Structures are given as structure tokens and as C-alpha cells.
């Protein structure tokens, strides 16, 4: 690619939708040719074994906030290789890493006995959006037991309640409005929200976890923005946990083009090979990359991944 075309391509890449702060940070650096860290952003990496990488992104100032379009706060991304084929021991290790990071964030905001409300966002009947409601069914709820049968629990048991508020299309009520009513009645000191996210990378589908203490704007990653669920709107700290389950179609196309260009450049001695092609030849080569067989294969892989949720 020419320098001008490359710059345009980088700017377009930055516009791709993603809920992950780490990806927004990486895209911004690429689009603006930044080799060091972005002003107002702090990043720290920690590797656990060969398969788990934890990246902590801190947005420290308004400048950092504007750069990656994420509020000031802490964003932790846990990338787990081979999660979809992990054995029991590997799953346990991944669980311990997630637990450690989540506990550290919770401890920053509340004490060990403060009541917590867990919220599972999403539509149970739409596979890529069903993460939140499905997780809610697996959580140990204690609020009612502490109220009516406290003798069956340890003294240090935290009060945990949970709700899956559905989606606006089926309830006619904004999630923020539902949660405001719940908060006013049961007075949790912290809200933990679980939701499906969008990613810039196919490789992160069902293989990465983001934990953030800035709350969440439901639907923002796929252009269907709803009212924000944050400390400002709900009155209590909000921690959001999400796993990417969708990627934008343009992402798949862009990745295919990138792989195609890289492959051609590897096989050619220089970029002269590309420059010598007529526009019609370039079009035919690109069309070959995006042939129905290639697209069908990509769709199949994504479908298999989502089915593992």
C-alpha cells in the first residue's frame, strides 16, 4: 500500500466497533503512528504460564479518555489461549486469574460484607447476546437466605442478589430504569454487570474477558446505544464483566484483506509486484480472497465458537 492509502486504512481501522479498551488503545496507536504509550493512558501486562495474558489499561485523564473513547477508570483484559479446548486444570487456572482480578477491583470499592447486586444483561433467546442471563442462573444467591435462614450460612457471607432485566424490545423498559428501582429498594453497595461484548478480533471471540470499574453503556459496541449503567446514573459503583461474542462484518473483510496483502508482499521481492497490477487484476485478487468459500469458512468458525458458550 502507498503511504497515503496506508494512512487512510489505519484511520478506517480505528472506526471499527469494539467494546474492549485494550483494542481501542491499540487501534488509536496504530492510526496515529504512536510507538510509546498514549498520553493519559497507563498499561501493564502480566503473563500467567504460556496461555494467559492479563493487560491492565488505566485511563488517567480527560486526554486519555478522549483518545480511546473510554471513561477514566480501570480496564482489565484477560486473554486466554486455547480456552475453547482447555482441559479442567487449564479452566481452573483461568478461573483463578479472573477471580483474582475481579476481587481486587471489588475491594477497591466496597468492604467484604457489603451487599452486591449482580445483573445479567442481554437476550436469553439470541445466542451471541445470551451470556448475561445464562451466567445469572449459575450464581449463588444469598440475600434471601441471610434474611430468612441466616443460621445456615457463615457469619462472613456476603449478601448477593441477582436479576436479568431482559431487553428493551421485550420489556418496553430501559435497563437503567429497572435497576434504579431495584437499587432504591434493596440498597446494594455495588453492582456487577455481566454482558456480551463486541471485539475487533475474531481470535478474541469467547477467549477474552474484560473487567472494568467504569460501568457500561449497553449496545454501544454494536451501534445500539442504550442508557448508561454507571455510578453517576445508578448511585453506586458499577463493575462490568464482559466476553466478546460478536465481531463486525467489516472486521472480517478487513482482516482478510490484510492477510492477503501481507501474503502477496511476502511472496514478492518488493511492492513493485502490487504496483504493476492493473486495477482489474487487483479487484480479481481481492474477490478471490473474499470468495464464498472463504466467507463460509469464517462464518462456520464463528458459529462453532458461539455454540461453545
Indicate residue ranges for each PLM-predicted region.
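Conserved small/polar residues in nucleotide/adenosyl-binding loops
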Residues: 4-12, 298-305
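N-terminal amphipathic/basic leader segments beginning at the initiator methionine
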Residues: 10-69
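An N-terminal, well-structured beta->alpha segment
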Residues: 64-108
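Short glycine-rich or small-residue beta-strand-to-loop segments that form or flank ligand, phosphate
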Residues: 77-81, 115-126, 162-166
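Glycine-rich phosphate/diphosphate-binding loop of Rossmann-like nucleotide-binding domains
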Residues: 123-158
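A structural-propensity feature for long, helix-poor, extended segments
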Residues: 155-182
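A structural signal for small-residue-enriched, beta-sheet-centric alpha/beta enzyme cores
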Residues: 163-164, 193-301, 307
